Amino acid sequence: MASNFSIVQCLFNRDKYELEEMRRILVEAEQDESSAAKLLSEDDMDINPVRTAVLRSMGKIHPAQMDYYVDYMEMFMAAMKTMLHTEAVVERVPCTEDEEQPCYATSQRLSGDINFAAGLIASEPVYLKLAERYSEEEIPEMDELAKDSLEEFINVLNGMFSVSLGERKIETDLELPRFGKNVSPHGSHQLRLRVHSSVGSFQVVMATDEFI
């Protein structure tokens, strides 16, 4: 299982850096993680910094979904690094703004013992960069390769999440991924979180039903 420890998230949680400076740290950490480690003090240390960020963002909302949303975001942020080879951090407050248009969304619903839907929404430039990171191919404009790449990423990630739920005796089935353009999500028990990455910012959306 991937570690939930993230040097860059520890730094971000301490509010020491403006967003532009944090983006520079993410880019540099992608090339050499020790560059971020040198900025880390003992006071910054947190073995589960993504969990800390998501719990703060949720506060007292959606208590029945809290464990699932926190666990999913920990898995999502780990996958950013292991599957997309991209350094990223998540905000500690809910996201309320829609993405700049044109933007694209990819999501997938899990049904069974629980109902859960999750995915991402990104402006076109960021969506393409994320697709390039996953496919390891250049994608200069929106096409089927971009769409298919992020559908596959979400499908693999959500499959891993479904397996982790199964280990807790929570059985779920994966539905087919969904794709949308210029989406303003409105799911039940919805949580939107902004993720800042070395290729740009986007949002992760979690809900108990489809939001596309």
Give short role names for the model-derived ranges.
Residues 1-67, 78:
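Non-catalytic accessory regions
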Residues 14, 42-43, 53-144, 194-212:
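Generalized protein targeting/export and membrane-interface segments
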Residues 15-18, 87, 161-172:
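Conserved NTP-handling cores and scaffolds of large molecular machines
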Residues 33, 100-102, 186-189:
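A short, glycine/Asx- and small/polar-enriched loop/turn
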Residues 89-99, 170-183:
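Long, charged, glycine-rich C-terminal linkers/tails
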Residues 148-152:
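Alpha/propeptide regions of enzymes that mature by internal proteolysis
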Residues 156, 160, 164, 207-212:
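Mixed-charge, glycine-accented linear interaction segment located at domain edges/termini
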Residues 182, 186-194:
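Low-complexity, intrinsically disordered Gly/Pro/Thr-rich segments
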